[in-house]
Amino acid sequence: MRSSSRNSRKPRRVLGLAAAVSLLLGSAAQAGEHNFVLTAYTNGRGGQALVSGDYDSAGKALSYKPTLSAFDNSTNSNNRCVSLTVTRQWDAARIACDKAVKDAEREKATLPSFEAWARGTEDDFVAVALSNRAVLRWRTSDSEAAAADLKRAAELSPKSTFVQRNLSALEYSHQALARVDVASK
């Protein structure tokens, strides 16, 4: 659901993104730049629980229908994608991650012309969704689709560390076992 003021919502949304936290796959001895990273919005439903590793609480928070005061659909669907991916609910995660990409793209497409200044931020949100879906695709042995998602994410948000890190992890995964982290921007 859109806020009446994207001006106030977007900066808080960006500020609500937090630091990386290791979650699953691989040994702790591996170098950080070779770990996949999932990105959650900590100021969205379930976000704080995801970053702290409380996946049961995150799943419960994300199972409730949004209220009028809830964050936009792309924030919720993105966090649902992360939650289902880290809990290895692959079929549900595919649906959630596809929805996260569609919701972020829809938000970008419906951005009013007087808010064109926010276009770069909207690109970042689409890149987050694509990057998360790429991690899911890699985890379910679809490296080709993961690479396509990451390529598109890099085109939209070339300076995003989460995209660069996942590109590095995907490249590294062809040589050795990579692992997944959950992070926020």
Name the predicted role of every residue range.
Residues 33, 64-73, 103-123:
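Flexible helix-coil transition and linker loops at the boundaries of alpha-helical arrays
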Residues 35-36, 136, 147-185:
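Terminal, low-structured helical/coil segments at or just beyond the last alpha-helical repeat
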Residues 37-68:
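Alpha-helical segment of the N-proximal tetratricopeptide repeat
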